[in-house]
Amino acid sequence: ENSFYRTFQWNQNVSFFKEENRTCIEIPDQNIYVYGLSYEHLEIHEALYDDWKKSDKRGFHVLMAHGGDEQHIPLDSRKLAEGGFDYIALGHRHQHQNLFKDWCLYPGALEPVDRNDLGEHGYIEGTYDQGTVRTRFVPFASRSYQNLYLTVKEGVTQYTLEEMLRNEIMKRGGKNIYHVI
């Protein structure tokens, strides 16, 4: 109840889901309907989005859903698709992933959060025109976590090993964070 999100004085153009139940926020001048719920517990094991459907109102219908594993609102992509939404914006996973091309995807984290967040990180840029959604992934991260494999032969000195490592890091980029294997 005393969360910063609940006590902060937000601008009038900022909306958020205040309760952990089905909510639809309407942007009337643009005929946009955004569906979602507040995530108020550390873990939620129920598949809360399975039976969600868009309303019959004419416009662009977006589902914002956080979850995707057994501890954090399990998601069934087939049931999400049956909801009839024009776009489904997913959150929780740090890796970019398309469940359905252009209209149901995880953007991932803008920057890698931990050493398991390998690969590119960025954001989703999208357009909606005459009933068609088009999206593209835009790389954004200033650095990445990478596995770095070194083959070390018997007799290699520590100095030589450090030089091999330094050279390989400089080839790949000095800003990145490496897990040496």
Language-model features, listed with the residues they occupy:
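Binuclear metal-dependent phosphoesterase catalytic core
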Residues: N21-Q30, P107-H179
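His/Asp/Glu-rich metal-coordinating catalytic cores
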Residues: E1-T127
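Structural beta-sheet core signal
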Residues: L63, H179-V180
